[in-house]
UniProtKB/Swiss-Prot annotation:
Stated name of the protein: Large ribosomal subunit protein eL39
Single GO BP term: translation
Disulfide bridge partners, by residue number: none
Gene3D superfamilies assigned: Ribosomal protein L39e
Similarity field: Belongs to the eukaryotic ribosomal protein eL39 family.
Keywords: Ribonucleoprotein, Ribosomal protein
PROSITE patterns: RIBOSOMAL_L39E
Source species: Pyrococcus furiosus (strain ATCC 43587 / DSM 3638 / JCM 8422 / Vc1)
Cross-referenced SUPFAM superfamilies: Ribosomal protein L39e
Length: 51
């Protein structure tokens, strides 16, 4: 990927990176392990972003 990216694209990629985290441990504890995964998790090789 290009080193010089447009700011809007960089912000979109940063948002996608922040969203792509696991469910926090405190949420798992609070919900008594009902919530373990979240469906919007993205693996970089399988699902590509619309850029």
């Amino acid at each position: 990927m290009a080193r010089n990216k447009p700011l809007a694209k960089k912000l979109r990629l940063a948002k996608a990176l922040k969203q792509n985290r696991r469910v926090p441990v405190w949420v798992i504890v609070k919900t008594n392990r009902r919530v373990l995964t979240h469906p919007k998790r993205r693996y970089w090789r399988r699902t590509k972003l619309k850029e």
